[in-house]
């Protein structure tokens, strides 16, 4: 049983039973009891500080709120909820949504038009999510929309725009930047060889450093074995930055499950 970790300022998901139910997803199963209790505390703080606004008739339940908060809390488990202080609202669509956007093609021409988005993280505004993809973020699959958008906010704390370099010690910036760009180039080489669909990781990581940081962070938390094998140096960078070791957690859980098999 997870003990209720505070006595006052109870978050919107009001009961311990609701938190325990919200925790029951594969992504969070490797966390030990101390980490789960800490995660609930951070998630509760996030629910106190942020408003989750359902759009297009979506009915928002307490379990949905709790699970969204837990996913936001995971990357800042050891950093603290204050690291996500750059926004006040989480806008939640039922499914991927259409926005007007501008983009530049390979020839430098700028185009504009409707684009389907899964999520957005505005520099001085809300995070936008969709519930369909949030639900797909519950597994240990390498995909996590909430972590992706939360990481953009962490990235923006280092100067106001997402560059792929979060607030880290000055002495570590050169190595981080070098290794992140090396990972992008390595992934692009793989994409050129086998195509986007057959690539070992989401091709979106090769588009720019900010997206590479966000996408690889998804793997760090939800497919740590793949990231540690594919880009071990980036795994170590992330482990130091987030102050977490998801691979060790997963291996511990796997060992416990193996020990239970007769």
Swiss-Prot record:
The keyword Chloroplast does not apply. InterPro entries: MetalloPept_cat_dom_sf, MtfA_enterob, MtfA_fam, MtfA_N. NCBIfam families: PRK15410.1. Zn(2+) binds at residues 111, 148, 152, 211. Involved in the modulation of the activity of the glucose-phosphotransferase system (glucose-PTS). Interacts with the transcriptional repressor Mlc, preventing its interaction with DNA and leading to the modulation of expression of genes regulated by Mlc, including ptsG, which encodes the PTS system glucose-specific EIICB component. The keyword Ribosomal protein does not apply. GO terms for cellular component: cytosol. Its EC number is 3.4.11.-. Belongs to the MtfA family. Keywords: Aminopeptidase, Cytoplasm, Hydrolase, Metal-binding, Metalloprotease, Protease, Zinc. One of its GO terms (biological process) is proteolysis. Pfam families: Peptidase_M90 (PF06167). The lineage of its organism: Bacteria, Pseudomonadati, Pseudomonadota, Gammaproteobacteria, Enterobacterales. It is an enzyme of class 3 (hydrolase). Interacts with Mlc. Binds 1 zinc ion per subunit. Its cofactor is Zn(2+). SUPFAM superfamilies: Metalloproteases ('zincins'), catalytic domain (SSF55486). This is Mlc titration factor A. GO terms for molecular function: aminopeptidase activity; metallopeptidase activity; zinc ion binding. It is found in: Cytoplasm. It comes from Serratia proteamaculans (strain 568).
């Amino acid at each position: 049983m997870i003990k209720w970790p505070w006595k006052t300022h109870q978050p919107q998901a009001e009961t311990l039973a609701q938190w325990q139910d919200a925790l029951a997803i594969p992504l969070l199963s490797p966390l030990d009891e101390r980490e789960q209790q800490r995660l609930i505390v951070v998630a509760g703080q996030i629910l106190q500080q942020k408003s989750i606004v359902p759009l297009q008739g979506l009915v928002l339940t307490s379990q949905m709120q709790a699970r969204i908060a837990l996913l936001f809390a995971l990357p800042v488990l050891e950093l603290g909820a204050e690291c996500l202080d750059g926004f006040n609202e989480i806008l939640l669509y039922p499914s991927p949504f259409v926005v007007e956007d501008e983009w530049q093609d390979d020839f430098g021409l700028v185009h504009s038009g409707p684009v389907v988005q899964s999520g957005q993280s505005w520099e001085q505004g809300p995070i936008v999510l969709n519930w369909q993809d949030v639900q797909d973020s519950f597994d240990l699959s390498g995909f996590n929309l909430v972590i992706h958008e939360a990481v953009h906010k962490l990235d923006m704390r280092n100067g106001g725009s997402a560059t792929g370099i979060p607030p880290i010690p000055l002495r570590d910036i050169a190595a981080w930047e070098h290794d992140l760009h090396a990972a992008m180039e390595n992934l692009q080489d793989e994409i050129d060889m086998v195509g986007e669909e057959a690539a070992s990781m989401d091709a979106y990581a090769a588009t720019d450093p900010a997206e590479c940081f966000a996408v690889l962070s998804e793997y760090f938390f939800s497919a740590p074995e793949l990231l540690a094998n594919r880009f071990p140096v980036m795994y170590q960078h992330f482990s130091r930055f987030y102050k977490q070791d998801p691979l060790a957690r997963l291996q511990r859980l796997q060992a416990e499950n193996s020990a239970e098999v007769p």
